[in-house]
Amino acid sequence: LKKKIAVIDRQKVNLSTVAFVQIKTSQHNMAWAKKFVEGVKEMDEVIEFYRLSGASDYLLKVLIPNIEKFDEFYKKLTNKIDLSDVTTSFAMEEIKQTSALPLNYI
């Protein structure tokens, strides 16, 4: 086990909006990546953060109370570091969410 967690109903803690933020960059050097990663890790709204292959370079899963708070988050993100493109999709409905791992591959 890495750690034990409590699963909290995000609606009850005013985090009803889920945003998936795709980021493209023209910068692919270590100095830029380090600054970007450190900046994103400081942002409490980001609950998942991935470096990707394909059309986008990074994907963030962000929890916020509403669109106005997302706009504040977006401005904070884009002021931290130079990004080529930021595209956001908002979840309309959560169909499945789990932290349980698929252990049938062991």
Predicted feature locations:
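A compositional/biophysical signature of low hydrophobicity enriched in polar/charged and small residues
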Residues: 1-106
